[in-house]
Amino acid sequence: MDAKLREDLFRRYVASLENRLEEGAAEGGGDRQGAKTEEALISTATALLGSYQADPGQRFRMLRFYDVVENSLRTQRGTSLRTVGTAFATLETICTNLLLFPWKKEYRCIKTFTGPYVYQLQSVLCDSDLRSLLRSMGYSREQELQYNVRDHPGGASHLRQLAFELLLAQAECRLLGEVVSMSRGFASELEAVELRRNTREDAAGCADALRRRDSLTGDLSRLSVRPLDIDRAHLRRSGRPSKSVDVTDSAGHWHQASKPVLKASLSLRKEPLFVDTEEDMKDEIIRPSPSLYPVAAPPSYSPVADFFPIQSPPSEPYSYHLSSLDEVDLYTERGLGGHQTPSRPPSREPRDSWVLKGHMMKCQGCGMGCPSLSSCQRCDMILCSSCHAVDPAPCCGFQDYTKTSRPLDGYMPIKEKLSVYSSAHSHTHPHPHPLPHAQSHSLLLDKAVMSSKLFPSKPVGSGPSPVGSLVSSGSSSSGGERLSVGGSRCGFCNKPGASHTCVNCSKVSCDTCMSLYASDLCTRKNPHHNFVPNHQLNFKSSTISHLVYR
């Protein structure tokens, strides 16, 4: 505001106060005319404050307007520029009443429990700012419930200047509201106050500055997010790209049209799925998982690769590998959708190695756990590498060790079983130790063949077998004790001939593993395994009407 215009407006304001005093002394009904005059003065002050000013600090000389408004908007709940303008209007009324009618007692005392003080001053302005403004008028709070006035050393001229700046404060609040409305929602009232404090622009210039600052803030926020978008660019899709045109997405990231993209499959396998980006994937929703970022690095842009795509075969059939099933996205991932998953090469691992992955096996020679175990070539006993290196071997290498390669409950290895059924009359055996009761092979073989002819619908393992007769004492009757053929495999070493079963966890075991794993945890309520021979289990099996093949 220009100094000359400010002085002219101040003279008009003082003249309106004198007219109000004369009309009030004459009739007491000049309130309506005074309100119209004050509204015209506020409109004029708003127009003058909204014009270009050389020095923003000359708007208010006795009043810390921007500090008071900023503290009010930050600390008081429900405060706005409109309520702050109402508070300044109330303070102006208090100041003009004290200026025009200093002899009236009702104007020399302010009660802190009255409605105007509580709802228009105390709930809007900070307590320290309110005390400072009332102290500048000459009021001091000697008691808790009221302010009392004392003669100010500045006199009437000081009160006139203060009342005039309170009028300018109302006009500035109205101007700030117009700036916020012209910014079209790009700025808040507090941002408008902070900008208006130091700017020399008019109201329209302040609104434009707020809009520019908001757009700049949005650009900076987008720039801060751009590195993450670059990392995810290799997982995005476009439509059907052309090999002769640079392929970009909506964010401006480059794609290599011929490079396969790694995706996780819904089949919960650990094999990757390579999808060509040239396929039509318009209906696919892409939400890359953060776990895929370290797997595949974002491709670097090369214009030569766009115009001359070169497809190099991968060095390995499976160069990417998902570390766990937790990295598979089950929510936004589509199915195979006609794309062929590369077939898994056949596994060359023996079946015994599958069992070794499940739990830590123990050596049957030393009883120690070892991750790498292998069976003996002569007696099929599972030994560790150290036991294999011992000469003679602890299984069948000692001459005084009476080794039988079958459990006590009727298991006979496959080699011996083949020798029994192939050459029943020739009692030769590949095992270095001869089998006991070898003279009864032909008789038991004939008995097994006859029983299979008489009872064709009976399961193989339900009746006595030549294998069971070989291990039994020979005095058992035909229906005496239940013998088991070595059909089930041990749950620890995966060898046939599981003769014992844990009654707690139902895990089957051979004789050798039963002694090794009897003290292990059972993973049930009982701490250790409780193995019982199979022929002592209390269960009844129903008769099966058909022949069971294993």
Curated annotation (Swiss-Prot):
Alphabetical keyword list: Cytoplasm, Necrosis, Nucleus
Domain of life: Eukaryota
Ranges of residues in domain PUB: 83-156
UniProt-listed Pfam families: SPATA2_PUB-like
Disordered: annotated segments: 457-480
Subcellular locations according to the entry: Cytoplasm; Nucleus
GO biological process, one term: programmed cell death
MF-aspect GO terms: signaling receptor complex adaptor activity
Stated family: Belongs to the SPATA2 family.
Function of the protein: Bridging factor that mediates the recruitment of cyld to the LUBAC complex, thereby regulating TNF-alpha-induced necroptosis. Required to activate the 'Met-1'- (linear) and 'Lys-63'-linked deubiquitinase activities of cyld.
Protein name: Spermatogenesis-associated protein 2
Taxonomic source organism: Danio rerio (Zebrafish)
